[in-house]
UniProtKB/Swiss-Prot annotation:
Name recorded for this polypeptide: Polyribonucleotide nucleotidyltransferase
Keywords: Cytoplasm, Magnesium, Metal-binding, Nucleotidyltransferase, RNA-binding, Transferase
Compartments reported by the entry: Cytoplasm
Species this protein is from: Ruegeria pomeroyi (strain ATCC 700808 / DSM 15171 / DSS-3)
Catalytic function, reaction form: RNA(n+1) + phosphate = RNA(n) + a ribonucleoside 5'-diphosphate
Length: 714
């Protein structure tokens, strides 16, 4: 019944297996990939015809982690998987980015790639497995795909690169100082197509070495997919790339001069209007048949790209008048918003971000329900890209994939310089509002995020800056690397290469390649040029940091204390009675962790001290030999009970009240009376033994034997 094809190989410490022919046989391509006990199914389907008038490539990549894969039931009211999580969205983008450029140019039929996590061993991250499964499914589906690709994850420990570190190793690099890199690389047999990373101030050489190492490690996987496809691939879809050379010639003849003049305008808005006018003039000169051609958009883009690229490669001149290495003018300001905890406005040319930092308590941490466990995150970065930032009218609503991806890139860049949670026990939320955009808005978020956190008083290890690099690569091998690219240069160029870091090294690298043939030499030049740009931006940012506040007066103060774990129950009390009383009396917010760390938060220092003292009185143990001030709570025939240490009571035996015989303790004591007592010790049953007679009741000083004898002699 089943015609199953299976291929396996040893990859690092695990076995990688590809299988097809048993599940989802009606899909154009279906592959189940297994690494260890992590298993992902990828299914590919594509339309046989292009929709009329469609002038773009409608590729959709969907990635979903099923809770049953890890033996879990989804949370929430409905108890089923719902909208994509951040991890699912980022993984879908991770798969989309390297495969999109590899479809045959001109192919615009709808393609759907669906990756479903079926099993997760909590060791091997399913994102890499999904990428390999998707590549294999595309390769056998018959769709015009110039792959395959493969991907891997690389760590960096003690100067050594590590292939596919475990999920636990990559959970939080701040808590694992030995692990300095989380890098994902995807590529073909000949070229690197995509890089995504989070690093702890690696040098350019270390980062380039990691990418090179990763590309070498994916070669056996590419070979495995090729041999797998040789046994089970379907017949290639009959597709001939469209020939629109005549249409392009007509477009070029009708408006090259006007389009070239439009691209000579340095102001973005004026240039955009002039380019739009040139397009309309070209369309007006074309025939109805040419206007109806579905490749008109491609012909116009080819004309625009030729003008922009030719000027850069041949003359070294960019559309805004800069050379290839110059960063646009920068203005950095902090402390703009009076009631926020920290704020910054970062402007670079026609790209601008208003970035705001808010400091919260442990209650504000983000709870994440993932396949590999539940955990909390105390650093959040949200990126918003409203339509007005590019002068357009558009959809306003929940963040899209692009906004989530850009926010995570900025998050990775800043994560490396954050203080340890034990040193700075705040939840940090950074929001980047992109108010203007003409390229590299994610890197503006990095710069603005660094400034706003410093304005809020977050003790960052160093300021972080980011810059977006571009590439123009011609067919003859000539190329130009561009620093701080514009939106048009990103759209019409061959590479988007974002680098963020400190003065000491790189904290984040993201690269997307639109063409094959990116050599190590080009990558090395791009990294070197990016470092120069980063240093320039950091110098400009430092001009704004001199006025940064030490700590926002509007932010809550947090003090931490450690208590024994066996005392947690006493602090909470039956049904939470004790902790509620502490919060009500002190006015502070109190968070208790399972490890005994307590965070006390309040804008008022007196409130924090009151809560601290109340907790300390519950958990602290009285010391033998110390003198305490207490209050008589009960009088009995054989002595008096004194509350002397928090809620702790002890017995002052009648013989320990005074240096004379008493008929009854009530002769000298009454309930509510304040007395000073010395802790003599504990009896066999753990009961507290106190003494009043060895303490001067006026001064609180202990009466030593010499003083006692002298007083008796008098």
């Amino acid at each position: 019944m089943f015609d199953v094809t299976t291929k396996s190989m040893q990859w690092g410490e695990e076995t990688l297996t590809l299988e097809s022919g048993k599940i989802a046989r009606q899909a154009d391509g279906s592959v189940v990939a297994t690494l260890g006990e992590t298993r992902v199914m990828a299914n590919v389907t594509f339309a046989r015809e292009q929709k009329p008038g469609q002038d773009f490539f409608p590729l959709t990549v969907h990635y979903q982690e099923k809770y049953y894969a890890a033996g879990k039931v989804p949370g929430g009211f409905f108890k089923r998987e719902a909208r994509p999580t951040e991890k699912e969205t980022l993984t879908a983008r991770l798969i989309d980015r390297p495969i999109r450029p590899l479809f045959v140019p001109g192919f615009k039929n709808e393609v759907l790639v669906m990756c479903t996590v079926l099993s997760h061993d909590l060791v091997n991250d399913p994102d890499i497995v999904a990428m390999i499964a998707a590549s294999a499914a595309l390769t056998i589906s018959g769709v015009p795909f110039m792959g395959p690709i493969a991907g891997c994850r690389v760590g960096y420990v003690d100067g050594e690169y590590v292939l596919n570190p475990t999920v636990d190793d990559m959970q939080d690099l701040r808590l694992n100082p030995e692990q300095r890199l989380d890098l994902v690389v995807a590529g073909t047999k000949d070229a690197v197509m995509m890089v995504e990373s989070e690093a702890y101030e690696l040098t350019e050489a270390e980062m380039l070495g990691a990418v090179t190492f990763a590309h070498a490690q994916i070669q056996p996987v590419v070979d495995l997919i090729v041999s797998f496809a040789e046994q089970c691939a379907k017949e290639p879809f009959d597709f001939t790339p469209p020939d629109y050379s005549d249409l392009y010639a007509a477009v070029k003849a009708a408006g090259e001069e006007q389009m070239r003049a439009a691209f000579a305008i340095t102001d973005k808005q004026e240039r955009t209007a002039a380019v739009a006018a040139a397009r309309e003039a070209i369309k007006a000169a074309l025939t109805e048949e040419q206007l109806a051609d579905g490749n008109l958009g491609s012909a116009l883009k080819k004309l625009e790209a030729g003008i922009l690229r030719g000027d850069v490669v041949k003359g070294g001149k960019r559309i805004d008048g800069r050379d290839t290495t110059t960063v646009r003018p920068i203005v950095a300001e902090t402390g703009l918003l009076p009631r926020t905890h920290g704020s910054a406005l970062f402007t670079r040319g026609e790209t601008q971000g208003l970035v705001v930092t808010t400091l919260g308590t442990g209650d504000d941490e983000q709870f994440i329900d993932a396949l590999h466990g539940n955990f909390k995150s105390n650093f959040l970065l949200h990126y918003n890209f409203p339509p007005y930032s590019v002068g357009e009218v558009g959809r306003v609503g929940s963040p899209g994939r692009r906004e989530i991806g850009h926010g995570k890139l900025a998050w990775r860049a800043l994560q490396a310089v954050l203080p340890a949670p034990t040193d700075f026990p705040y939840t940090i939320r950074v929001v980047s509002e992109i108010t203007e955009s003409n390229g590299s808005s994610s890197m503006a978020s990095v710069c603005g995020g660094s400034l706003s956190m410093m304005d809020a008083g977050v003790p960052l290890k160093s300021a972080v800056a980011g810059v977006a690099m571009g590439l123009i690569l011609e067919d003859d091998g000539s190329y130009a690397v561009l620093t701080d690219i514009l939106g048009d240069e990103d759209h019409l160029g061959d590479m988007d290469f974002k680098v963020a870091g400190t003065e000491n090294g790189i904290t984040s690298l993201q690269m997307d390649i639109k063409v094959a043939g990116i050599t190590p030499e080009i990558m090395e030049k791009a990294l070197s040029q990016a470092k120069d740009g980063r240093m320039h931006i950091l110098a400009e940012m430092n001009k704004a940091l001199s006025g940064a506040a030490d700590f926002s007066v509007h932010a809550p103060r947090i003090e931490t204390m450690q208590i024994p774990t066996d005392k947690i129950r006493e602090v909470i009390g039956s049904g939470g009675k004790v902790i509620r009383e502490i919060v009500e009396v002190s006015g502070a917010k109190v968070d208790i962790n399972d490890d005994g760390i307590i965070k006390i938060a309040s804008p008022n220092g007196d409130s924090i001290k009151k809560a601290y003292d109340m907790i300390w009185s519950i958990v602290a143990e009285p010391e033998e030999g110390q003198v305490y001030t207490g209050k008589v709570v009960k009088i009995v025939d054989f002595g008096a009970f004194v509350n002397f240490f928090g809620k702790r009571d002890g017995l002052v035996h009648v013989s320990q009240i005074e240096n004379r015989r008493l008929n009854h303790p009530s002769d000298v004591l009454k309930e509510g009376q304040e007395v000073k007592v010395k802790l003599l010790g504990f009896d066999d049953r753990g009961k507290v033994r106190l003494s009043m007679k060895v303490v001067d009741q006026e001064t609180g000083e202990e009466i030593v034997p010499e003083k006692k004898e002298a007083s008796e002699a008098e």
